[in-house]
Amino acid sequence: MMEPREAGQHVGAANGAQEDVAFNLIILSLTEGLGLGGLLGNGAVLWLLSSNVYRNPFAIYLLDVACADLIFLGCHMVAIVPDLLQGRLDFPGFVQTSLATLRFFCYIVGLSLLAAVSVEQCLAALFPAWYSCRRPRHLTTCVCALTWALCLLLHLLLSGACTQFFGEPSRHLCRTLWLVAAVLLALLCCTMCGASLMLLLRVERGPQRPPPRGFPGLILLTVLLFLFCGLPFGIYWLSRNLLWYIPHYFYHFSFLMAAVHCAAKPVVYFCLGSAQGRRLPLRLVLQRALGDEAELGAVRETSRRGLVDIAA
């Protein structure tokens, strides 16, 4: 964010690095293809969760994650177009800066939501009685709204301190805010990994040791997906803005992995919820991926309607 130019600045840069242009174009083309697939997948998840799937707390989390990934991929695909066209197309500075800031904003939102849903799923597994009886009804909605609001505040502070949107940028304040963002990223990663580890230990220490399935299994797979595919983008972005040294090839690698991270989530949802040897509608597949809670909610709703019909 300290440098508005992002796309196109690495290809052919005068830093003495020997780049294989053909290899870079292949990586960028793969990134665009994965981004397009991710847009379709997250769009399907967004549509199904907002219209067809029974609303439960975890579905609301996935709805917000899909929304953040959808915006991220849209900005991601547009931002690398100048690299893909090898400088034949260039964006104005304010467009590049807007794409960069919006992309990091959605990245932090998605990571924060993953940490929140990991903690809530861990609490549901460790304290099932308390979770069923004492959990505030609108906790998920409040957590999601607060996450978007706090990430938007960080986004505005970084935009004000590091760009010329709101006046002259302050280099010292900008670096301080990026250090805060780095600490936030580390805390979110530790929280997410700690909650997932406790959830895994809880499942393994159960009486029959069943394999993680349903929504707990989905959370564990999503966390692993972030650590291997989503984290490199955050490391690159923070290193770039804090002027830390990073290998030159890490630029294309982190962008490709970010596209893999967002595009693979819908695949994980649908694969985990699909039944072997059976063809199910996407709505039922996604409902199965949400786990027993969604199915229990649907059963309760059906039972309540049956009682109403009998009483009538």
UniProtKB/Swiss-Prot annotation:
Q: Name one Pfam family in it.
A: 7tm_1
The family database entries (Gene3D superfamilies) matched by this protein are listed as:
Rhodopsin 7-helix transmembrane proteins
Q: Which InterPro entries match?
A: GPCR_Rhodpsn (IPR000276), GPCR_Rhodpsn_7TM (IPR017452), MRGPCRE (IPR026230), MRGPCRFAMILY (IPR026234)
Tell me the residue ranges located in the Extracellular compartment per UniProt: 1-20, 81-106, 163-176, 239-241
Topological category with respect to the lipid bilayer: Multi-pass membrane protein
Which SUPFAM superfamilies does its entry note?
Family A G protein-coupled receptor-like
Compartments (UniProt record): Cell membrane
Provide the transmembrane region boundaries.
Answer: 21-41, 60-80, 107-127, 142-162, 177-197, 218-238, 242-262
The alphabetized list of GO BP terms reads:
G protein-coupled receptor signaling pathway
- Keyword Hydrolase recorded: no
Q: Which residues lie on this side of the membrane: Cytoplasmic?
A: 42-59, 128-141, 198-217, 263-312
Q: Which GO terms describe its molecular function?
A: G protein-coupled receptor activity
Protein family: Belongs to the G-protein coupled receptor 1 family. Mas subfamily.
What this chain does, per the entry, is described as:
Orphan receptor. May regulate nociceptor function and/or development, including the sensation or modulation of pain.
Alphabetical list of PANTHER family matching this protein: MAS-RELATED G-PROTEIN COUPLED RECEPTOR (PTHR11334), MAS-RELATED G-PROTEIN COUPLED RECEPTOR MEMBER E (PTHR11334:SF26)
UniProt name for this protein: Mas-related G-protein coupled receptor member E
